[in-house]
Swiss-Prot record:
It comes from Francisella tularensis subsp. mediasiatica (strain FSC147). Belongs to the GcvP family. N-terminal subunit subfamily. It catalyses: N(6)-[(R)-lipoyl]-L-lysyl-[glycine-cleavage complex H protein] + glycine + H(+) = N(6)-[(R)-S(8)-aminomethyldihydrolipoyl]-L-lysyl-[glycine-cleavage complex H protein] + CO2. GO terms for molecular function: glycine dehydrogenase (decarboxylating) activity. The glycine cleavage system catalyzes the degradation of glycine. The P protein binds the alpha-amino group of glycine through its pyridoxal phosphate cofactor; CO(2) is released and the remaining methylamine moiety is then transferred to the lipoamide cofactor of the H protein. InterPro entries: GcvPA, GDC-P_N, GDC_P, PyrdxlP-dep_Trfase, PyrdxlP-dep_Trfase_major, PyrdxlP-dep_Trfase_small. It comes from the Bacteria. The lineage of its organism: Bacteria, Pseudomonadati, Pseudomonadota, Gammaproteobacteria, Thiotrichales. The gene is gcvPA. It is an enzyme of class 1 (oxidoreductase). This is Probable glycine dehydrogenase (decarboxylating) subunit 1. The glycine cleavage system is composed of four proteins: P, T, L and H. In this organism, the P 'protein' is a heterodimer of two subunits. Its EC number is 1.4.4.2. Gene3D superfamilies: Aspartate Aminotransferase, domain 1, Type I PLP-dependent aspartate aminotransferase-like (Major domain). GO terms for biological process: glycine decarboxylation via glycine cleavage system; nucleoside metabolic process. Signal peptide: none annotated.
Amino acid sequence: MSFIPHKLEQIKKMLDTIGASSVDQLFDEIPRHLRADTLKIKDGINEIQLANLMRKRANKNHHNINYIGAGAYSHHIPAAIWDIVARGEFYTAYTPYQAEASQGGLQVIYEFQTMMAGLTGMDASNASMYDGATALAESVLMAIRSNKKAKSQKVLIAEALHPTYLRVLETITKHQGIEFDIVNLDSKNGKTDVTKLEDFANTNYAAVVIQSPNFLGQLADVDGITNWAHKHGALVVAVTNPMSLAILKSPAEWGDNGADIVCGEGQPMGVPLASGGPYFGFMTCKMAHVRQMPGRIVGRTVDLDGNEGFCLTLQAREQHIRRAKATSNICTNQGLMVTAATIYMSLLGAEGLERVASISHENTQTLATELAKINGVSIRFNSAFFNEVVIDLPVNAETFVTEMEKEAIDAGYFLGEYHSDLANSIMVCATEIHTSEDIKEYIEATKKVLARIGG
């Protein structure tokens, strides 16, 4: 149906019906000074003129080299990935309830689940969550449901958990009677001191949350914390960067018995930064907990003719069947982002992922080492890290970051917002996209900025 503007008689009839004297009266709650009576739009232009105009405007953009990290990472995305993802079969797909008409999409999700289960060392994976923070919240709720032996709904969290993740976790669980205790980190190494866990030994916890690499980039003492948690009857929820698992041991190998649930942000694998989203969260677990897992799960089966097929499985957990008794009110998944991640992992393979992770670590190590050679600059913590490290500066870090932007460099994440003791600290992150020349430019820009602002 074509759009036909309303005639004056139709507008009058509408106003008379609702008892309004004019169209303006419909918007009287909007202050007059906020209304735009006319828009300053020029006359129409042709396609060539439009292309030239947009090209000129695009040239005004300045692309800084990004070293921020802190939960969102700049990695190279092979061109083939989004060329494939943008195909109509993927781009416009809907939840594959009708399995016989959705085998392609279902298989992609199944392959994703298989890869994520392999990467994390777990038995099962769901089809994804909204993002890393909501994946953690759902993992905590899942752990509480699964831990039938726990006598409380208390959860123990290491302080170096990503602060945004913690806020989302608190928001989602606010009215569910769940309590959180925080284990303070060691100021010398930026991670949880396992000996401090004994201060909580007399409290019954349903779950313990461990992030490694943690928010400050440090590798947690995952073995010690995991063993302590299991000894005291708690399930272990691991939060991790999937890229790090290409070179670090999987959560399944943490401690004597491994983590129970693994979650995190999948953005590093083929998903662009895109001003904060859309991203996707991943969640995997041991088979013992799979019936408490939220979200879609795709299974592989054989039909009556012996042909391999895929379908949504264990659907009795989900909202469209169990309604209020479902494991979660999430009734979707980030299918498009999952498709990108699946293609990314397929293209790179195990060796490619390991190479990306190794180069990211090496570049971060090089950047940190070179920065520490500058007078007044030092590496804050003396423990192992993956691809992020905290740097202490002789000046206010927020001022430093602002000045570095003038050098076309996003120098890092200002940590003063995270902790008052870190007002002169930034967290820097390097990945495989940063060249040796990029790192040299960062070092020279740092010297220049420190000289300019009195460092």
